[in-house]
């Protein structure tokens, strides 16, 4: 059999009319299989042309569900024709031998529509399968992200914490699960404590991996420090981290602030790489931006970072914020938002007060505590948001 031709089953009573009907169909280059019932039809049958009287009315629904079917009749008032049409068969034609060309066109069109419907059903089934697979992969990815976020939060220091009479606290709110923000503070000895505040470019898994590297390296470098020249520790860390990120070739850079507090001389030794917003120091009723500037860490090779220092009074509050905070503030320009942040900080004595004031400007921040774990019920923040506050010196360990 030529498989380029379609096989049409003609169901009608044997006789000259059935033969003529079959001949009219074969004129269009189609094969015809003639039968007087629907019991035995070839598997490759593409369409059925059935006479209204040749099929019992109780079999029309079975026929319609099996193959596309055209009904032919000798009269438009044929009761069997009406029953067949009510079942929902493809179409019908009266006096088919008088309208042989129309019959052939209807057959071709019905086969074409059936092929399109079958293709659509296959596409729908394939799409449902792909959607199910996608949902499964998304669920696994979500579980991985949640697990990664949990591990990342375990790497953060305990909060709040007092080190050598200086109070450290922070608010950590990832955009979704994993964050490109990170911070840490540690006691070196009775005289020195060190801390850092980082905002890795982007957010999500790749940025979070950089924070793990940062944690490992800073712990190692602090353990290797001999306790001499505290003013060199911060810029040396930034330069070393810059080389590490350059060497990884992962296309990530970071803004990074590193500070060393001398608890004997009440001095902050620090260095910074493209920190935005700038660290804000509140002391003696005044709010000032810490001086200094530096290039982003990991963006350019062979960068030297500044060695800076400032005196710390007996009572002070040092605030460090990631740039995600600016996304939560009103104002069309960066300067407007920075001034708004400075105003909120000047009015806040505790981290909770600043957070409450920020929540009044952004509804997402009011949807639950995001400090200890990401809140899966809230919408994603526009960016990772982290705030760190350092205050001293009068706190009891």
Where are these regions (language model features)?
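CheY-like receiver
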Residues: 49, 60-122
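Flexible nucleotide-interacting loop at or near the entrance of a catalytic core
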Residues: 113-133, 137
